[in-house]
């Protein structure tokens, strides 16, 4: 724990003014993906930080791929363009293996005058553990964390005529799907319902961009686990991917998962084969789908912001549909039911303003700024945030999104600890694109992806031929 005492607000302000004095007038440059969380940090929290410290922040929010390209090229070259970078949970292990990041724990020990009295690692949720190195030191300070739940149109699911028609056709009471067969039947029903009633409505979304890693991530992080396939289908002891060598990437479960997912495209809006996480949220918020797996960072605005969403007050939230046994595996710690996403800001070794950047990382981590951030961006990094009355009010408006994350978040998992994350993704994602376009069948795609994965992991030195 870096700090154990809390100070009155005026004392807090005095700390920031004094700590920022040596760096007053300098400009910190940061790069992040343009997400609800980062945009709130840029538009609100960064301005407060500047007012209290005199340190300016030039905050670049851009697309996911551009964000990574800019940050990695800067850190590889050591050019020092950026003083802080966004670190998504799934890439932290690659950054640590390449020694890109400043050790925050050690720096605060070495420079105690920079340690803010309002920065307390004990206040964070367990999500902070993802950003620690092998010795337990912190290399990134979380700024967002959220699950990827199942959203559904609560108004449609509660409509008496809809419920009657659904039960007449399928023989069970319409409710959020608990397994994949139910999900498919709901998708089929509402797609037909949209056609029959001349509505721009389909039964589901699919994050199936045929040329963007978003589709790969949807499958390995959100779909495959619900069928009982974890860690991308890799055997984490031998780094095998094929069933023949002890992996599960091309197992029967994995093939059933990919077949089901690709099959959902016939019940999804036409934009689905060009949809990343952003387009999925846009499709659902426009009322174009009856159900969807949506990154939680979008849950709040979809359910509450009438300026951006047409389904305000009409959104329900639930756990993803699961195959038998998957929930029990997750509850016992031997699996997970979906993706626990999020990110942190970290300081590159190449930064020319490390001390000032460290103040910024601590500033946005204060308990005092968490409530507004959570309400507006559906992210929670501090345990106490869930108990705040305003967050509880927003929980009601979102039909229980925050309480679902609090109570069931432990069933979700972050990305596996793969230092080769990026290399392997690039090697095997094209097979998933080919399955989406129909160039390969799901079975062919997984057989070829598994073989290519073993080839790549052998080349990288992880798997022995």
Predicted segments, located by residue:
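Extracytoplasmic/periplasmic substrate-recognition and gating elements
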Residues: 156, 263-269, 307-380, 412-413
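Extracytoplasmic "Venus flytrap"/periplasmic binding protein-like
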Residues: 47-123, 137, 160, 165, ...
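Hinge/lid segment of periplasmic solute-binding proteins
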Residues: 10-22, 89-149, 219, 316-321, ...
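Extracytoplasmic "Venus flytrap"
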Residues: 15-44, 146, 416-419
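Short, well-ordered beta-strand elements
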Residues: 24-36, 55-60, 83-84, 360
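Short, polar/charged alpha-helical segment
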Residues: 14-19, 36-56, 155, 428, ...
